[in-house]
A protein has these predicted regions:
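Short small-residue beta-strand/loop micro-motif enriched in glycine and branched aliphatics
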Residues: 25-28, 107-110, 166-169
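ATP-dependent carboxylate activation and anion-phosphoryl transfer catalytic cores
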Residues: 115-186
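Short beta-strand elements
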Residues: 20, 73, 84, 159-162
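Phosphate-binding site of ATP-dependent enzymes
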Residues: 38-126, 147-154
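Short connector loops/turns at beta-strand edges and beta->alpha or beta->beta junctions
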Residues: 21-23, 101-103, 161-164
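Active-site nucleotide/adenylate-binding loops and adjacent lid/helix of ATP-dependent enzymes
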Residues: 1-57, 63-65, 76
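Broad gene-expression machinery/nucleic-acid interaction feature
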Residues: 13-15, 66-68, 142, 155
Length: 186
C-alpha cells in the first residue's frame, strides 16, 4: 500500500499493476497501470493517490486468462458459470480497465460459460469458494481471477456488492447464462 509514492517498496517482480485501493469498476485502471520498474511504479502510485485521495496498491501483474465468477448463497455458495474476459488483439499486458467496463468496446469479448477443462473449472470453483469464505461474504459476490498458463489461479479482486444492472452487469449476464432470470437473481 502506497500513500505518498516515497515509501520503501518491497521487492517486486516486474511488471506490476498499480491501482487505487478502494475504487470500483476498475476506476483508475488503464493499460498505463502496468509498469516495468520501480520509478514508474512510484510515479503511477503518486498520480493515483493525488487523483483519488486514497492509497494505491502495487501488485505483481499476473499474465494469463481473466475470469469473473459469481457466487450466491451463504455457507456453501452456488458458483455460477465462470465468464472469461477475452482480450481482442491484446497488448503485451492487457487489463480489463474502467473504459472497457463502461463501453461496448471491441477490445474485449466475453465467453460464458468459459471454455475450461473439468480440472480448471474445479480449481476455479475451489478458489472462489475459499475466497468467499475467507472474507465472510454473504448472499452474493463476484470474484475476478487470472489463471496462468500452468493453471495457477490468482484472485485479483472480490466484489461483495457487484453491479446488478439487467443485461449489462457481469453478474446479471452470468446468471442469465446459468438459466436464472433477473427476478430470481434479485
Amino acid at each position: 500500500m502506497v500513500t505518498t509514492g516515497r515509501e520503501k517498496l518491497k521487492p517486486f517482480r516486474y511488471p506490476v499493476i498499480v491501482k487505487p485501493n478502494a475504487e470500483g469498476t476498475s476506476k483508475g485502471i488503464t493499460s498505463a497501470s502496468v509498469v516495468k520498474d520501480e520509478t514508474a511504479a512510484r510515479a503511477a502510485a503518486k498520480q493515483l493517490v493525488d487523483r483519488y485521495h486514497q492509497p494505491a496498491l502495487i501488485e505483481e501483474y499476473i499474465t494469463g486468462r481473466e475470469f469473473t465468477v459469481g457466487l450466491l448463497g451463504e455457507r456453501r455458495p452456488k458458483v455460477l458459470p465462470p465468464m472469461e474476459v477475452v482480450f481482442v488483439d491484446p497488448p503485451t499486458h492487457p487489463v480489463y480497465g474502467y473504459e472497457e467496463k463502461q463501453t461496448d468496446t471491441p477490445r474485449v469479448r466475453f465467453e460464458c460459460p468459459a471454455q475450461l477443462t473439468p480440472s480448471e473449472l474445479r480449481r476455479i470453483e475451489k478458489v472462489v469458494r475459499d475466497t468467499f469464505a475467507a472474507l465472510a461474504c454473504r448472499d452474493v459476490a463476484r470474484v475476478d481471477l487470472r489463471m496462468t498458463k500452468d493453471g495457477r489461479v490468482y484472485v485479483i479482486e472480490i466484489n461483495p456488492l457487484p453491479g446488478l444492472t439487467p443485461d449489462f452487469s457481469d453478474l446479471c449476464v452470468i446468471a442469465k447464462v446459468a438459466g436464472m432470470d433477473y427476478r430470481s437473481l434479485i
